[in-house]
Amino acid sequence: MALLTLFNQIWQEGQLQSSTSSFNIFLVPILCLSIFILFSLTRSSSPSEKNRKLKLPPSPPRLPWIGNLHQLGSFPHRSLRALSKKYGDVMFMHFGKVPTLIVSSAEMAKDVMKTQDIVFCSRPQTTAPSILFYDGHDIAFAPYGEYWRQVRRICVLELLSLKRVHQFQYARVEEVAELVSKIRKASASANGAPINLGELLVSTSNNIICRCILGQKFEDKEDNWFGETTKELMTQVMSFSFGDFFPSLKWIDRARGYLAYLKSIWLEFDKFFDKLIDEHKAAQKEGKPRKKDIVDILLDVQNDGSLDFELTTSNVKAILQDMFVGGSDTSWTAAIWLMSELSQNPRVMKKVQEEVRRVAGKRGYVEESDINEMKYLTCVIKENLRLHPPAPLLLPREAMSDVKLGGFDIPAKTQVFVNAYAVQRDPKVWDKPDEFMPERFEENNVGFVGQDFELIPFGAGRRVCPGLAFGVASAQYVLANMLYWFDWKLPSGGSKLAETLDMSEVYGLTVHKKSPLYLVPTPYSP
C-alpha cells in the first residue's frame, strides 16, 4: 500500500509538469507492469555477499524495492529524528536502491565532518542539481576533486571573504534603510493593523544579494520573474527523481516530463546569465567608474589566468547560480523564524531591544560595528539557528571509500545525511531542547561557524557554507535595525501568545515558515 501511495503521489506531481497528457494514458499500464516485475524480483532477492559480511549500523525495517522511502514523511528531518531515538545516532537506511547513512549526534557529526572529512566530503550526483547547476560545476553540488577545490578557493578568497563582505556594506546599509522606511509607511497606512513583515524581509534580502551579485536591485526585475523562478528552482532541487533512487527506472523521469521541466528552468536562468554577463562585459569595455559586483570579479578571475584550469562561461554561470540560491533564501528565512520566535516571547523581545537601543545610544541609527557589542542579540540569533537551521538536513555527502564510523562498516558510495535538526535538539546536549531559550548561550561559547559540532546550521569541514560570513552579516544588520526602530507585537495579542502564531513548516532545500508572518509595528523614537 505504501508503494502504491508513493508512486501515485510522484506520478501526480509529474503530470502537473508534463504537457504530454495523452501519452501518459498509455504510460500508466507500462509503469505498473514495470513496478510489478521489479517488485516481484526484489522480493526474492537477498543481500549481497559483501553486505552480509559487513557490520552495518542499525536499520529500521524496510520494504522490498523502495527500502525506507516510505518512512521519510512530509518532514524528513523530523521523521529521521524520531527514528534515530530508536535506532541510534548512526542509522543505515535504503532510499530505493541507494544506501544511506543518517547521522544524528554531535559526536558522529564531528567524525564525518572533521575527523574523516576527507572521506566524506564528496557529493552524490543526482538529477536535479546536475541539470540546474551546470552538470555539477558549481560549488555546493560538485563532487570533491581538483575542480571543486579551485572554485571553492575563488569563492573563499575572492567572492565571499571578510574583506569582500565589508566592501558590500553599502548595499546592506542602503537596503536596510529602505526597509525601515517601508515599515514606517506600511505601519502608518495600516493604522495599527498588522503588516506582512515576511514579504518585506524577502524583498530586502533579495535586494541585498542582487545588488552584490548583479549590481541591480531585485525589484528592478520585471514581473517578479527573478523571485518566482528562484523559488521554483529551490523547490525542484529537492524534487523526486525515479532515476536517483531506481536507476533502471530513469526513463520514467523523461516520460513524465520531469527532465524537460528541469531543463526549462535551467534554460531561463541560462538566458538570464548570458544577458547579464554580456552587459557586464560591455560596461567593462566602456571603462566607466562603478562599484564592482560579483559578476565583475568572476570575469576578472576568468581573464587573469591565475587558475590551473580554464574558467568557462558555464563555470561562471554555475557559481552565480549557487550565489543566488544560497544567498537569497537563507537570510530571509532565518529572519522570519527569529521574528516569529521573538513575537511569542515578549520577555526575550524586550531584553534584546533594550540591548540594541542601549548600544546604539542616542546616535539615532545602528552601525554594523555596533553588533559586536550586542552579546544578547548574538545569543538570540544562535538560539534561532539552533531551533530553525535553514537546511535541517545538511546537503548529502558521499563516502569516497569504505570506512569505519562509530564502530560500524560504511561502504563506499554510501549517501550521508547529517541531521542538523536532530543534533541541535539532542537532549543529551541541550536542556529543554525544543524551547526557545537564548540565555543558554550566555555562559556557553558554542559558535555556529563549524568549529562546534553541537551547533551546525551551516555545516562544517570542507563543505561548510562558504557564504556564511556574508549571510550572517546581512541577517544581523537587518534584525538589529528592526529591533531598534520598532516595537513588535502579534496581531491578536492576548495571553495565549503561542497559540496565535502558526509555526508550521514547508519542507524544501531550506525549511520555510508555512504561513505569512503578520506583525504589528509601533515606531520607536530614540
Swiss-Prot record:
Heme binds at residue 465. One of its GO terms (cellular component) is membrane. InterPro entries: Cyt_P450 (IPR001128), Cyt_P450_CS (IPR017972), Cyt_P450_E_grp-I (IPR002401), Cyt_P450_sf (IPR036396). It is a single-pass membrane protein. Its main location: membrane. The chain crosses the membrane at residues 22-42. It holds the Pfam family p450. This is Phenylacetaldehyde oxime monooxygenase CYP71AN24. It is found in: Membrane. Its cofactor is heme. Expressed in seedlings and leaves. Its EC number is 1.14.14.44, 1.14.14.77. GO terms for molecular function: heme binding; iron ion binding; monooxygenase activity; oxidoreductase activity, acting on paired donors, with incorporation or reduction of molecular oxygen. It comes from Prunus mume (Japanese apricot). It catalyses: (E)-phenylacetaldehyde oxime + reduced [NADPH--hemoprotein reductase] + O2 = (R)-mandelonitrile + oxidized [NADPH--hemoprotein reductase] + 2 H2O + H(+); phenylacetonitrile + reduced [NADPH--hemoprotein reductase] + O2 = (R)-mandelonitrile + oxidized [NADPH--hemoprotein reductase] + H2O + H(+). It comes from the Eukaryota. Involved in L-phenylalanine-derived cyanogenic glycoside biosynthesis, including prunasin and amygdalin defensive agents. Catalyzes the conversion of phenylacetaldoxime (PAOx) and phenylacetonitrile (PAN) into mandelonitrile (MAN). To a lower extent, can convert various aromatic aldoximes and nitriles; mediates the transformation of 4-hydroxyphenylacetaldoxime, 4-hydroxyphenylacetonitrile, indole-3-acetal-doxime and indole-3-acetonitrile into the corresponding hydroxynitriles, but cannot use the aliphatic compounds 2-methylpropanaloxime and 2-methylpropanenitrile as substrates. Keywords: Heme, Iron, Membrane, Metal-binding, Monooxygenase, Oxidoreductase, Transmembrane, Transmembrane helix. Belongs to the cytochrome P450 family.
